[in-house]
Amino acid sequence: MDNENRMLYPMKFIPVPGLRDWGGNAMLTSFGKKLCVPDGRRERVLTADDRVGECYDVADLGYIDSMIDNGWFGGNTLSELMNTYLERVTGERAFNWYGTQFPVTVKWIDARDRMPLRVNPDDDTAAQRYDAFGKTALWYVAEAGEDAALYLGFASEVSASDFYAKCNDGSVDELLNVVRPKKGDSFLIKPGTVYSARGVVLVEISEASELSFVLHDPYGGDTQLGEAFDLIDFGPFSACCGECCGDRDGDCCCHGHEHGCEHSHCGEHEHCQERGHDDRSAVKLAVCPQFTASGIRLDDPMHIYCERFGSFLIYTCVEGEASLQTASEDGKRTEQCVLRRGETVLVPAEVPDFFIVPRDKDTFLIETGLSDVEDDSEECCGHGDCGHDHEGCDHDCGEHFGDEPEDDDFGVDAGWSPHIYN
């Protein structure tokens, strides 16, 4: 391919919608997405009358393969990008572990009505039974209606026989832990946790897997209760993160203490607090072996050095609008990728550094990457070096380890600077 030696760049993808009985129209109305579905040999443009339950922004799932929508690699799919550019996309450590499989999926969920109750397998079970990844997922609440509800696990320990009976007679809600979410809440859904939702728009960050099983469908659809029965955790649900309280290994959901954490000190521990950050810093939402996610309130430009992360980065715009700005290939001018509300952009690991500049007030982004599981240092959202410059760092001390790199260390000409919007 003629472009194999060209520098990669921030990439946006054509969103892939999924029509669902329980879906709504928020993707089209509130978030302004332009969505199409196959209709014979043609495509049909979706309207506000269509019920879009899911919308995949970044996915390498085989049956869903995101197509790049900008730049010189536009028109190619994410799997083609991976097969061509390998570790230049994901980073060397991620490539050594995942190969040409892109490791993370980003999608939106619009549950205007009640979703079916589901459960996800863990990685070991999924590998043994289905030769696939399991599914750990983060839900971030982008919008919540007056009747919003999340159904996460059980209110108290239940017996398998009671659960089975109530799934079959339609009264399973009596057993479930019900959370009344508000905009900005986040929840880590671990394998084995039964889950559903109603009246919310969610951003879901997950492993590259859609392997899940329907336990109860309020619309009378097919279920896989028997196949998934031994996957279910029948204990009471706890939203408390593992890293903050120390008794749930490897998982973090730093906002879980607002919704039923049983630890009295939760919210006072240094990991539960949004510690040392200001409106420009990355606030940890989740850290687990499969991915890491942070929320960024973007009031001022941020300069991010990708080499400190060692992996790709993904940004999803929940509110406002931003511009990702990189140096051109000759290093003498600025190239921009505008990120509007409801859009997602992938920054390949090869991109040395870039600026994120707000184009609107109250801009809020979700930043997704990979945890450096081989590094014992877990500062700044799970990374040894968080990648943000001094203004955006959320270390307790407010400073980074060491000095910022010189411009030419990252191949950026000293004359390149970001465009600031007034």
Residue map of PLM features:
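Histidine-centered metal-binding segments
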Residues: 240-277, 377-408
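Double-stranded beta-helix
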Residues: 152-174, 203-242, 366-382, 409-422
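Short beta-strand segments in beta-sandwich/barrel cores
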Residues: 303-304, 320-326
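Short beta-strand/loop turn elements enriched in aromatics
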Residues: 141-163, 282-285, 300-313
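Transition-metal
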Residues: 1-158, 219-250, 273, 293
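Ligand-binding loop in jelly-roll beta-barrel domains
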Residues: 101, 109-114, 123, 144-147, ...
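Short acidic-glycine-tyrosine-enriched beta hairpin
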Residues: 176-188, 196-197, 327-351
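His/acidic/aromatic-lined binding-pocket segments of jelly-roll/cupin-type domains
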Residues: 106, 115, 137-140, 178-179, ...
